[in-house]
Amino acid sequence: KDRKLIVAGNWKMNKTVAESLDLVNHLTRELASVREVDMVVCPPFTALSDVAKIVLETDIRLGAQNMSENGIGAHTGEIAASMLKEFSVRYVILGHSERRQFQKESDELVSKKAHAAHAALIRPIVCVGELLEHRESGQTEDIVGTQLKGSLAGLSAEQMLETILAYEPVWAIGTGKTASPEQAQEVHAFIRGQ
């Protein structure tokens, strides 16, 4: 099956609302004729509403950087999938390496979030990747395989077709080391074989 490329921009905890609007207006002007790839922007939550108003009239899709595994309720600081849908969010990043590392998000939690995303008809972008010590000790496939198995647990075949897997070579982020295209392709091939 042919796959259309997806380019997703995670703005992380950068960009004020005004800066987000400047950036998305620039993107819509510069990328208006691009049809070969699906483009997704994932601004900070504070800018979702304003960015949504702009991208709804374009081919750029709106994504969120995270979401709760829970529905609406007493979950301070969280955001439910149904809330994201109000802004026409179509994608959500789950299991990003920073959330796994700093918020101690487990594969089990990522799986719960993926199920919640699918229930709301939001496409999860599930991130997997290994640290430098795993890469250097030859554990890449073990680590990535474990993350895949746990993060995708219980998803149906149909849900799997609507789930995007993103490989993050965590070992190459801020270390001065660079992941070569060949190294990334090796992991992509492993992921596809799972």
Roles of regions detected by a PLM:
Residues 1-194:
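Active-site loop-to-helix "anion-binding N-cap" substructures in soluble metabolic enzymes
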